[in-house]
Amino acid sequence: MSVQQLISRLTDIVGSRYIITDPTKTEAYRSGYRFGTGNALAVVRPATLLEFWNIVKVCVEHDVIVINQAANTGLTGGSTPDGNDYDRDIVVINTMRIDGIQLINNASQVICLPGSTLNELENQLKPFGREPHSVIGSSCIGASVIGGICNNSGGALVQRGPAYTEMALYAQLNEKGELELKNHLGIDLGETPEEILTNLQEKRYQVKDIRQDCGHGHDHYYCNYVRQVDEGSPARFNADPARHYEASGCAGKLAVFAVRLDTFPLEKETAVFYIGTNQTSVLSDIRRHMLVNFEVLPISGEYIHRDAFDIAAKYGKDTFWVIKKFGTHWLPKLFSLKSNVDRIGKKFFFLPQHLSDKFMQTVSKFIPEHLPQSLWDYRNKYEHHLIIKMGGKGIQEAREYLESYIADGSKGGYFECNAIETQAAMLHRFAVASAAIRYRAIHEKEVEEIVALDVALRRNDQDWFEVLPPEIDNRIISKLYYGHFMCHVFHQDYIVKKGYDYEELEYEMLKLLDKRGAQYPAEHNVGHLYEAKPTLRKFYKELDPTNSFNPGIGKTTRKKYWAE
C-alpha cells in the first residue's frame, strides 16, 4: 500500500486539519525538548480514544513505525524520531487533544486519558484536598500524566517514588503482527474495542463496574526503600525491573489509552527550610538522620550547587518570572510559541539562530531582581544548598533537629523560609534545567553541546559530590549539579567547550559513574541518549515483539523484529 493511501486513510479518521505532513510544520513534533530529531511521514492528532485506536490500526496495516507522543517535554528525546536510519516510514501520533480526567472512589483515584497533564490533574484534585503523584518540576512544563507513567518518571516527592501503576488500558502489537486492546483498568467497559474506548471516553460506567482488587496505583514500597540508607544500590532508577509493569516504564512500546492512579492527601501545613554549607558531609548527615530517624519523611529535599544557582539566576530569570506571575498553565503555550518563533526564524537567513532564546534573554535584563536577598546571602556564603520541605508533624521534627545540628554555625547555616522565600527557592531550583539550554543558545560560539546526565547514586554513597579528573574538567565550561537529594538522584549538566567531542566526553563520564556503582538514567528514561540495560531491553522486547512502536529507544536496534 502506498504512502498516499496511508495519508488518505489517516485524513479520513481525523480530518485534514489534524494531519500534518509539511516538514516545517511537523518540526516541533519531530524534535525533542533537548535531544532528538528525525523525519516523519506525518503527525496525526486524534481527538478521541477511538480515533487513536483506528490510527494505530491503519499504521499497523501499512507496516509503518508508530511513535506515540503527548506533551513532548521529555529531556532525552524519547517521544520523537532520532535520525533518519529507520527501516520503515514513521507516523507520529500526538495525543494532546484527547484530554480527560475522571475522578473515582471519592477522588482517591483517577482515570487519566492521554492528553491530560499533571498541572490539570493538580487543579482538579485541589477542591477535594488531594494531589497527584507529582506536583512540581515536570508539572511546571505541562508534562502529561501518561508520559510520566510510561517513563517511570521520578520527581521531587520523596514519599511517592517513581510514577507507577498496574492499571491501564493499552494496545499491544503481538508477535504475529496482530493489534490487541487490553483493558486492565479494573473497570467493566464492554467487550469490543469500540465499546471499551467509547464508554471510557464518555464515562459510561457506574460505581458497581469499578473493581477495587486489580492492582496498585502507585509504588507502595518506596517509602521503606528510600529509608534504607546503608544499602549499596540506588533507591530508584529506570532500569529497575521491580517497577516495570505493562504501561509503567513501557517508553512508548505500547499505545496507552488510559491509566488509573492513586491520589494523595494534600498537606494542610508545610514548611520549607533552606540549608547552606561548604561541607558535603553535612548534607550527608542531614539526609541520613532524616531518612532513618524522622517519623515523617520529608516531602522533598532538593539540592542545588552554587554554579547551578548562578546559571539559573541569569538564564532562568524569565521562566521564573512567568511562573510566578501567571502560573504553570501558561508554560505549555509559551513553549509552543517558542517553537513557532524559532521555526519562522530559520526561514530567514538574516535572523539569528535560537531567535526566541536570544529575544527572551534580552528581555530578562529588564526584569526586576527576582530572588530574595536571603537566597543571595546564602549563595555568597555557601557552595552547597539544600531545600527541605516538611509537612505535618515533620515540621517540628525538622525544626528541633536542625536547631541542634547546626547550632554553632561551624557546619553551615539554615533558615525557615517565609512564603516569598519558599516560592522563590522552589522555582529557582526548577529553573536550572531550562537555564542550561538557554546558556547554550546564547553562547553558541563557545559551546559545543550540553552533556546532561541523570544519575542515581548508591543509597550508602558518602562521596556523592563529583570531582572530575583534570583531563575531563578542562573540556568543560561549567558544571551544573542539582537534584533530588533524599533519593540520591542527581541531574548533572556539563556545558562542553567548543571543539571537543561531547559524545566521547559523555562516554568517559559514564565509565566513571560505573566505577561508583551508580545507575543511569535515574528518572528521565533512556530516550535516545542512554543505552538500555539488559533487563530493560528484555522488557521492551516482551512488550513489542515486532519492534514497531518507538524502535531504537535506549540505543536498541531500529529494525523490524529486533533484527541487528
Swiss-Prot record:
What's in the keyword line of the UniProt record? Cell inner membrane, Cell membrane, FAD, Flavoprotein, Membrane, Oxidoreductase, Quinone
GO process annotations (BP) = lactate metabolic process; respiratory electron transport chain; transmembrane transport
Q: Which EC number(s) are documented for this chain?
A: 1.1.5.12
Q: PROSITE patterns from the entry? A: FAD_PCMH
- List, for all copies, the residue spans of the domain called FAD-binding PCMH-type: 36-207
Family label: Belongs to the quinone-dependent D-lactate dehydrogenase family.
User: What's the stated role of this polypeptide?
Assistant: Catalyzes the oxidation of D-lactate to pyruvate.
Instruction: Please give the name of this protein.
Output: Quinone-dependent D-lactate dehydrogenase
Q: Which organism is it from?
A: Haemophilus influenzae (strain ATCC 51907 / DSM 11121 / KW20 / Rd)
